[in-house]
Amino acid sequence: MRSHYCGELNASNISQEITLCGWVHRRRDHGGVIFLDVRDREGITQVVFDPDRAESFALADSVRNEFVVKLKGLVRARPEGTVNPNMNTGEIEVLGTELEILNAAKTPPFQLDEHQSVGEDVRLKNRFIDLRRPEIQQKMRFRSKVTSVLRRYLDGNGFLDIETPILTRATPEGARDYLVPSRTQQGSFFALPQSPQLFKQLLMVSGFDRYYQIAKCFRDEDLRADRQPEFTQVDIETSFMSEQEIMAMTEEMIVGLFKELMDIDLGTFPRMPYSEAMETYGSDKPDLRIPLTIVTVSDLMAGVDFKVFSGPATDPKGRVAALKVPGGNALTRKQIDDYTKFVSIYGAKGLAYIKVNDKSNLEEGLQSPIVKFLPVEVRAALLERLEAEDGDLIFFGADSAKIVNEALGALRCKLGDDLNLYTCKWAPLWVVDFPMFEETSDGGITAIHHPFTAPSCSPENLKASPLTALSQAYDMVLNGTELGGGSIRIHQSSMQETVFELLNITKEEQEEKFGFLLDALKFGAPPHGGLAFGLDRLVMLMTGSSSIRDVIAFPKTQSATCLLTQAPGEVSEKQLKELNIRIRKPVVES
């Protein structure tokens, strides 16, 4: 139907007769001449209709925004003074000779260039119109390029694209499963996969050596700006490769991706132990663009006559830490109060601070409600350790180590954003040497990653001291966002059973939920490992989007609903009866 895309035309097409198809982006009537900006996925072309061609002129006069049209015309240079340098097609225009309306359109609920004044709920309800916006179309096209580059790299390195089941069984992987009732096995349920984890391990046992998949995954959890109930990951697994080899290969893949699509050189990724990340940045995904660091001062505060500090300082599970903000004296009392409210989200009971007005005067040069509780020698040691200068502000966290890390880690990132402290645009790294387990609130233990991650020690040492054992896990982090996480997997059944036992999974549960895996590990499972990248988050970062909803064609809301299709929805009594399911209405208390 067409000879060219709208956005393809340029000065090289001058004097050519062309045919275009697309949507009317804008219609203008200038002194008896009608201008139509016609849009398709490649861009916009200006088309001119003059009264000399009465039939096409009359049609052009009748069209409105978002009409679908087909037109023929002659490409010509724009008159002097009308060139638009902001458009790819800004040097030319098309003199329209024929026009056909392929479909009329109702007035859209919002104009494409006015989307910022429209609520997101309106845009998502009319997503088929929202997706016409050039900005969103560019992001969708960029996403397609990302998957194309990644596929090419993996194909070129001997990986096989193999699909794994979507209907599987529920396994404990950290989040709630989406369940699908079985009609043929009444009373039983499938689960949608949270990841292809077990199947890709079985593919390694089967001898496929290198596997990848652009996989849909599902998790029924509370949503944030970077989470969706269904999401896409680039899933990778390989046999006979070490932790270092897997990291080097996937780093090369991401470096190549950024270079090819954005001409950005990410360089070599530094590697940081988990303990250092938590101690210095309060996060296992530190944003290294921000130069602020967290410094432990528990030893300085252990003997002070201030229980808010001395209590956590002497508690084996507590921590007192400081965060220096260079030039932070300029922060107002209201700003400090706002930051105090912010850290309360993470369980902090308050946010102590000291303003350094004159570091040479330890008696009167420090401004703070808490400074009176700190002996002069503690003040001096504190300023020396933090390398504080006049004009700096020091925030403190004092609580359990977990709360201090989370609160000051989040505050560090918020300060970096609020005060624009970024020192570079891109800061990748690997976080390594994760603990195998962490303690739960009820005194039990849970896997930091998942129960199939291999430890760095023997089963005997793991049993003897599970909370000090390290895992062979690694996370790729970019700008404070986890791009991908992976590990070497357990490939021996005895080790897998040991991990299950430590997680208090009984023999019966092991057999019921993981019997197929334990059996497979007894039939010659090779050493193997892998990694999964969050595709949505990767594209979000690369396109500078604030939410992954901007890089997914049909996203869900933060309440896990689709405003376009009104999913999830009720089903008929007939369907429920076929599944032998009865809906129990919630009891409303009067």
Swiss-Prot record:
L-aspartate binds at E173, R219, H449, R489. The keyword Cytoplasm applies. The keyword Transmembrane does not apply. It is an enzyme of class 6 (ligase). One of its GO terms (cellular component) is cytoplasm. Belongs to the class-II aminoacyl-tRNA synthetase family. Type 1 subfamily. This is Aspartate--tRNA(Asp/Asn) ligase. The gene is aspS.
